[in-house]
Amino acid sequence: MTWHILGAGSLGSLWAARLGRAGLPVRLILRDRQRLRRYQQAGGLSLVEDGQASLYPIAAETPDGGQPIQRLLLACKAYDAEEAASSVAHRLAGNAELLLLQNGLGSQQAVAARLPRSRCLFASSTEGAFRDGDFRVVFAGRGHTWLGDPRDTNAPAWLTQLSQAGIPHSWSDDILERLWRKLALNCAINPLTVLHDCRNGGLRQHPEEIAALCDELGQLLHASGYDAAARSLLEDVRAVIDATAANYSSMHQDVTRGRRTEIGYLLGYACQHGQRLGLPLPRLGTLLARLQAHLRQRGLPDR
């Protein structure tokens, strides 16, 4: 069965290259004919590992391609996910499966609601990759991907193909708890790196601010029924800051480069969820307002 991959960014390209070199059938879906022509001129996807580049001539097409889609990896940004999924909805088989590889929360639920006949699996990944040019991606850090389905805990048989492709993964019966934990870590770190214009390690100068945010995030996780995700949150945030002290957060990099952030699916989603629960989150709300004002000042979308 063919893997269709929509989203030729860093993680989508990384998955496509590894699945393709394992001999599995893969097709990239590119947004329009102009993008397809540029891909064909490049000759395929380039994957750089340990300083060595390899070219993988993965087949590619546009969303209006004719072949039915049985399995789709959606690897675009959270704010593009629903529209991207809709662009190929007419091609989805009746029992199609979608693997949603988005940051934060909210986009996955929107896609699942838009495509009720399809099985939507959520994913949370710690793998590191970045684009080094058009259709060229650098594998920057080995990590792990957890996959799960909030509505069905039965793992699909095709997970063996991920092992065949050398993609470290685990099936998770509590994927939402994992995604909430990752969201909380992001909310405690990334917005502050933007507002203080610092590397992750610079947040060591703001321990009270970090502690106050973790306290509210812990309240939100407990109120949402994710007690395990709230456990040792502050300690883990400090550990992430120490382990990545020399790095700029992904949100800081987006803002610096004038790119839209995924704020609406991270800090924005946390604040909206608190409102739905009737849970006051004054520190998180203030942080969101400060970050939105900062983004508007730079001419960037604030949601």
From Swiss-Prot:
The keyword NADP applies. It comes from the Bacteria. Its main location: cytoplasm. Transmembrane segments: none annotated. Its EC number is 1.1.1.169. GO terms for molecular function: 2-dehydropantoate 2-reductase activity; NADP binding. Belongs to the ketopantoate reductase family. This is 2-dehydropantoate 2-reductase. It comes from Pseudomonas aeruginosa (strain ATCC 15692 / DSM 22644 / CIP 104116 / JCM 14847 / LMG 12228 / 1C / PRS 101 / PAO1). The lineage of its organism: Bacteria, Pseudomonadati, Pseudomonadota, Gammaproteobacteria, Pseudomonadales.
